[in-house]
Regions:
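C-terminal non-catalytic interaction/assembly regions of soluble proteins
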Residues: 2-160
């Protein structure tokens, strides 16, 4: 197995409990993420492009562990935990992206409410957590040796 550095990461952990948001969670997240990317462009222009970072929202309490492979498709909880993940070439960019993302999703509107809403309860203050360098697996080896011992040579020594 092998690992490679993919960049630096900053996360934000928060909960959503508003029943109006939970009823439309998927569309709220899609709109919210689009607004996050738009706001990043509005703030940073061409100095940070979409190719400079990876942004993910994990939803624990729905499919945070298995993602699209989750067999239980219906949301049956009264709250979910969102983890906003920003990964970039530098810690500074990752933290900037996470900070913008937190603010945008915190106040992402829904049709049932007018004016400014707060839809995300952040667990920590400051809300962003710098994780430092992050890695992913990049190699898996499959070997079929002729002899099961050939990959693990044994050397015997006589010690007096």
């Amino acid at each position: 197995e092998g690992a490679e550095k993919v960049g630096y990461q900053t996360i934000v952990i928060g909960g959503v409990r508003d029943p109006y948001i939970l009823r439309q969670l998927d569309s709220w997240l899609v709109t919210g993420e689009a607004n996050i990317h738009k706001r990043i462009y509005d703030v940073y222009g061409d100095s940070i492009s979409r190719d400079d970072y990876v942004f993910n929202i994990r939803v624990y309490g729905r499919d945070g562990v298995m993602g699209p492979l989750e067999p239980q498709k219906e949301l049956t909880t009264h709250e979910v935990c969102l983890i906003l993940e920003a990964t970039a070439a530098t810690q500074e960019i990752a933290t900037s992206i996470a900070t913008v993302a937190r603010h945008k999703i915190l106040h992402e509107p829904i049709p049932e409410w007018s004016g400014l809403i707060t839809g995300l309860a952040c667990t920590y203050s400051p809300a962003h957590i710098e994780r430092g360098a992050v890695f992913r697996f990049n190699v898996n080896h499959v070997v079929e040796p002729d002899d099961p011992y050939e990959m693990f040579p044994i050397e015997y020594m006589n010690v007096n």
